Amino acid sequence: MFDRFLDNYRNPENELANLLYGKVIDGLVKEERIKAEIKTIEEWEEKAAHIRKKFIESIGGLDFDKCNLNIEYTGEIDQGRYTIKKVVFQSLPGFYVTANLYIPNEIDGKIPGILFSCGHSKPAKAEPKYQRAAIELVLNGMAVLAVDPPGQGELIQMPDRNDVDWGVHEHSYMGLACSLAGMNIARYFIWNLIRAVDFLTS
């Protein structure tokens, strides 16, 4: 805010932030220029493939082997027009994912499947507003799989740690460990969802 009054002297307090901000702005300007140059579907598909490749590389890849999901149903709640099935599956060996599967009680052939990825709430799939959304979808004839992200719902990883809270704090704590190992925690979040799609289509 006061940079124009520095008379070409440096402001070390904000220098790193300003450098990073400048890089972000440069990147956004470049991206806008590249998007404006895309004229055909083929060019768009080529650009999309390039972005996808770079993104997957940036998180350390998604080159896991698809193991058996080892699906377990731990209970169900019959709500009349639909049933909620409590599900546990493994996205990787020993890496458990908890979810609720909402299924209409009257199914005639194949039905659409919705993967519901929960936002930042401690109860995750049990959050009332997320349940309401899933119920609206199942009442309209769709199967809905609501999945707990790591660090939320039944997947709180460090419940006995007073210095690491649920959600973003856990994500950051586990994410730092991943970064130190040369990878990104996002690959595990994404892989859980990829395997959730496998579950939905099985």
Question: What annotation goes with each model-predicted range?
Answer:
Residues 89-93, 103-105, 118-121, 151:
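Short, flexible loop/turn elements at secondary-structure junctions
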Residues 11, 35-46, 180-183, 187:
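Charge-dense, low-complexity intrinsically disordered segments
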Residues 22-102:
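Non-catalytic accessory segments flanking enzyme active sites
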Residues 4, 23-24, 35, 69, ...:
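General secondary-structure edge motif
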Residues 1-35:
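N-terminal hydrophobic targeting/anchoring segments and the immediately downstream early-domain regions
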Residues 109-202:
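Cap/lid segment of the alpha/beta-hydrolase catalytic domain
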Residues 8-12, 44, 165-167:
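Short low-complexity stretches enriched in small and charged residues
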